[in-house]
Amino acid sequence: MINIAGKLISNKVNNIRFFLNYPKIDIEEENDHVQQFVEVVNKSIKNEVDIFEDIVINTYFEENIIGNVNAISEFQIAFNRGNIISMPMEFTQIIGLTDISHIYSYNYDFNLMKKITLNDIFK
């Protein structure tokens, strides 16, 4: 069984406020290969969050943004059955009234230990 818990990064850098909510996956499986795959997936998700945070900070300083910036990430569990998960995650940067969003979907099959693509679904 796959358990998905939310982790939160909440901090402030200059006038940038971060509320980065991201998933941490845990699986009740004793197989070492599956556990290693779970760690790879968790590191990949955390890496995406870190990259988003870095991009927001770099953009703020490079473009000399005046005013407050809010950087937010949220995820939803769209599917979690039979060791297959699908979680869309939205990364949003709000500068004044301007909203820039990017949605990325994490789709994994922990039985096959691989990322699922549309080609896998529609064979």
Show the residue positions of the predicted features:
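Compositionally biased intrinsically disordered regions enriched in Thr/Gly
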Residues: 1-123
